[in-house]
Amino acid sequence: MSNKKELLWASRFNEPFDSEALRFSSSVHVDGKLYREDIQGSIAHATMLGEEGIISADDAHAICRGLKEIEKEIETGTLVPQWEDEDIHTVIENRLKEKIGAAAGKLHSGRSRNDQVATDTRLYMRERIEELQEALNDLLGTLVQKAETYKDSIIFGYTHLQRAQPISAGHYYLAYFNMFNRDTERLLDLLMRVNVSPLGAAAFAGSTLPLNAGRTAELLDFSELFTNSIDAVSDRDILIEFISCCSIVMMHLSRFCEDIILWSSYEFGYLEISDAFSTGSSIMPQKKNADIAELIRGKTGRVYGDLMAMLTIMKGLPLSYNRDMQEDKPPLFDSAETAISSVTLFNRMLQHTRLREERLKELTKKDLSLATEIAEYLVKKDVPFRDAHRITGKIVSWSIENQTPLPDIPLERFREFSEVFDEGIFTALTPEASITSKKSHGSCSFESVERQIREARELLG
């Protein structure tokens, strides 16, 4: 192999490109990840060129054979891109020239690096969307299993991080099921826009060669073909949308991780994480830290940064292609890899968590979270809700001042606040009764949770 690095555009210039400028502008250390997609796109392009008679069938065959050999060389480490190569497209084309000679120069007929890299990026995103979908579907399955396991367990529901009302633990897990399911729907919707071939747009204005863009789209399994050559090479909105989807996934993970971190702390003590997903302290022997959950929570900020980076890169660019767009790869790769690995590891961690049901049972029995049941009990007695709310607030205040749990307040004391109280109030003041009595659609009642679990299982097939 020759050590001479030939830049694809150098013939126009009388002076060699400054070495520091080349090092600064080289992207091969980043876009090297796209070698499979680049070779896949080039094979499709060469096949089409041969079929359309733009190049000979022999040249097309030689190009495709050489590209497949180069793919193996990169995979085995025989061919290692260097920064002097500028980008992965240059690496592959220069190596192809070394392997098959002048025929390699025909590969780029009717093609620009602009539509080439746009194609590579879409192929990459298509694969990452499928991987992220698969990871999310696995997580959805775990959430349904958790909901089934803990459907009869009672935990606190929170607002403002204050205990609010008792709920079925299954209802809690199903809340996250719905969030992550919407993430899969967003990705599926995005896939329709990603799966559009830009190959054939050339630099931005098309080509005078009789390219068959529909054929390359077919060979690359794209479902649609671009309609405007400028748009095909100059926008990165689908990339931004993908990172946005990753950001929402990470936001949902981060919220879930926050619950796990809090609930596994000594102060809460609701949940236990397996030792396999916990770490200790180098100085405090007693520590058991939820580091994996904390790391996922921290990585969320990084993916948000990827989204802001892309929005900022694109915000002032005139049509069509600009070299600024080279900077789209680090945010894309980072957000995809972070989201996929985070969902995968979170799912494994979640599978190895358990609720501390005995502690939760004791806490929910004697808690102020049953106050709403008093207010709704009064409403059922034909007391206007605002009056019921005011009366219940006074009862709660008395309960706190006298250190008496709501279920332990004597009936005569209840009747001092309102004469409509009778023995039925004590039937309502249990966590089980609170949950069972919920009648509204999608509520936390045990019956509703059972229905939600069935629907979730049907959704997953």
Curated annotation (Swiss-Prot):
The keyword GTP-binding does not apply. It is an enzyme of class 4 (lyase). Gene3D superfamilies: Fumarase/aspartase (C-terminal domain) (1.10.40.30), Fumarase/aspartase (Central domain) (1.20.200.10), Fumarase/aspartase (N-terminal domain) (1.10.275.10). Keywords: Amino-acid biosynthesis, Arginine biosynthesis, Cytoplasm, Lyase. GO terms for molecular function: argininosuccinate lyase activity. The keyword ATP-binding does not apply. GO terms for biological process: arginine biosynthetic process via ornithine; L-arginine biosynthetic process. Its EC number is 4.3.2.1. GO terms for cellular component: cytosol. Pfam families: ASL_C2, Lyase_1. Pathway: Amino-acid biosynthesis; L-arginine biosynthesis; L-arginine from L-ornithine and carbamoyl phosphate: step 3/3. It catalyses: 2-(N(omega)-L-arginino)succinate = fumarate + L-arginine. PROSITE patterns: FUMARATE_LYASES. It is found in: Cytoplasm. InterPro entries: Arg_succ_lyase_C, Argininosuccinate_lyase, Fumarase/histidase_N, Fumarate_lyase_CS, Fumarate_lyase_fam, Fumarate_lyase_N, L-Aspartase-like. Belongs to the lyase 1 family. Argininosuccinate lyase subfamily. This is Argininosuccinate lyase. The gene is argH.
